[in-house]
Amino acid sequence: MDEWVISENGLRYKVDFGKKQNSGLFLDMRYGRGWVQAQAKGKRILNLFAYTCGFSVAAIAGGADHVVNLDMARAALNRGRENHRLNDHDLGRVTFLGHDLFKSWAKVTRSGPYDLIIVDPPSFQKGSFMLNKDYQRVLRRLPELLEEDGQVLACMNDPALGPDFLIQHTAIEAPCLRFEQRLENPPEFPDARVDGGLKALVFKAEGLSRTGWA
């Protein structure tokens, strides 16, 4: 297996090209990382299912005050630390939590509230996450974690589920979140069906107060 360092939007990431299914960076999420970098200045950000912390690297580069990364895979989070170090980032502005989200809401809540929450789960993770039933469990907890005018970047890459899955379930589970836009995907990753490709959807909190619903 070969380890490489690549550059994207002026930032450096370690990737593995070889026998692993995942290289260490989802290249089709380039526009998503760019969007986060552009939004990040002065914000507290929660990065759920953080993997190797690509969103976190982009956020710190964009001037985020602090990023909390959560992922069950501690080896992936260790790679995330390496990615931050590659870019000479201050690790005092980054937290790494190697936990199961559904057993760690208290830890996540203590570090909030957040101005931006990124949700980018796997379609399936044996024993811990099934997208078509567990995404709803995440969505319903987002309002209690968000600042009053907070944003959510909700991502999904299951070809069997279109963007309406996220839009409709967000309306049910977190009605204070208004759908704003779907980010475009990079042209080097064309999809035979647009709805079957990567979905990165932006939502904005409305009518939310820090003590509950306004």
Question: Which residues fall in each region the model found?
Answer:
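Non-catalytic substrate-recognition/targeting regions of SAM-dependent transferases
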Residues: 1-26
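Conserved class I S-adenosyl-L-methionine
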Residues: 42-51
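Conserved SAM-binding loop of SAM-dependent methyltransferases across substrates and taxa
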Residues: 52-64
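Conserved SAM-binding motif I beta-strand of class I
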Residues: 66-71
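S-adenosyl-L-methionine
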Residues: 72-118
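A short glycine-rich, Lys/Arg-flanked "PGG" loop and its adjoining helix->strand segment in the class I
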Residues: 135-148
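Conserved beta-strand signature within the Rossmann-like core of class I S-adenosyl-L-methionine
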Residues: 149-156
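Class I S-adenosyl-L-methionine
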Residues: 167-214
